[in-house]
Amino acid sequence: MSIISDSLKRIKPSPTIAVTQKARELRAVGKDVIGLGAGEPDFDTPNNIKNAAIKAIRGGDTKYTAVDGTPALKKAIIKKFKKENNLNYSSEEITVGTGGKQVLYNAFMATLNRGDEVIIPAPFWVSYPDMVLLAGGKPKIVKCREVDNFKITPNKLKKAISKKTKKFIF
């Protein structure tokens, strides 16, 4: 009996990691490469962020926090949405995650049943289909054209929707 689940066996090696590693190898031999792999910033963390982190650590703010975000962070997010987007939210409507992919994966795991379809317009982030597969769903890729700014058209979306469609990434 294998220790690896059947779900994990369906996942392919990460193209993002492969292209990132290839770029590193080429740079190491002196090639001028523009990396289009992992989304690492090409700049150092700004000093105000470093200083805030140091201050928090020195102030003893080193323990686990609420999984969905601290009250202070939620308050800052609410303020941002009100000021910049004129949107009103309560703290119960705000959930913080470690990144967009993690939040999407959690949503898929919480809501998809085996065979549920998720419409994914292409081009897309390479992880999306595997995230859907791990959650038991079926990715349904819809190719988008440059002439449409690589956005799914209402007609293409309508054609992609079936009785098994449960989610649409946009």
Regions found by a protein language model. Give the residues of each.
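N-terminal small-domain helix-loop-helix segment of the aminotransferase-like
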Residues: 2-99, 106
